[in-house]
Amino acid sequence: MIPKKLKAALALAAAVAMTAVPARAEPLAKDVFGSFRASNGGPAQAIGGYSRGCAAGNVQLPESGPTWQAMRLSRNRNWGQPQLVDFLVGLSQVATQVGWQGLYIGDMSQPLGGPMVTGHASHQIGLDADIWMLPPSSLRLSPAQRESISSQSVVRGGVAPSGLWSAAHHQIIRAAASDPRVARIFVDPVAKVMMCKAERGNRGYLRKIRPIDGHDFHFHVRLSCQAGSPGCEDQAPPPAGDGCEEAAQWIRNRIDPPPAGPSDPNYRHPRSYGLSEMPRACQALVGR
């Protein structure tokens, strides 16, 4: 039998516990970085790695230019380090030399970089950009049209090029990969195989073209860390050689999938990172 006084004390403690304000959980980095609508305006600096980092001094790619349009403006992801913006403007001019009006530019980075609330694992340090495979039909699209229009795939059935793929795609991606600022370009393996088959000149740039799933509607350009960003972490260079056999193997594996390998039990998507798990300079950038 519990004494009445003890029973009353236990009841009071339970009531207090139920009404107490819970300890505030650590904010997720994606929510913190995703809340900023503008850059800090400081000196340009890429901080950390492509999938765990941030960016000081990002600049905004203008929504429209003579040879480009930024798409999906509602996402506010048309930000990047100055060298990325310069690269994209230059590549859009190259596109006009092969018969396109210019380029549709997809996601780049957020104003301060960092993890995003939706989508990408990378694109965090202002050095990544997605470029649509769809040749622009107009460079005077309204903001509403840029939300509704979609890119198109250059791959059919996962194993062959679609009717959209063209020599112009090859020339634009080759020009991008030939830029010394570019570390690698991610494309669907079918696109890489088509480039491997068609290339009759210098094949050195093909090393930078990396096959990966989910990149048939756009290609993803990644720049190397630049001088002035000592805290930027480059990836290891791509494997030696042109990588064409590797891309062909990707397609063979789609036709005849090998047994699935074990998943990495330690993998976490960057959207799950707490702010304290980001580089200290990134925590300082957002004032935490």
Describe the residue ranges of each PLM region.
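Active-site acidic/histidine clusters and adjacent loop/turn architecture
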Residues: 34-36, 40-106, 168-172, 179-182
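Extracellular/periplasmic catalytic domains that process cell-envelope and extracellular macromolecules
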Residues: 96-98, 122-127, 177-178, 212-215
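Bacterial N-terminal signal peptides that target proteins for export
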Residues: 2-10
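Extended, low-complexity, intrinsically disordered C-terminal regulatory tails
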Residues: 28-41, 87-118, 186-208
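Short, surface-exposed glycine/acidic/tryptophan-bearing loops
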Residues: 118-136
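Sec/Tat signal peptide C-region and signal peptidase I cleavage site
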Residues: 21-25
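Bacterial N-terminal signal peptides
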Residues: 9-19
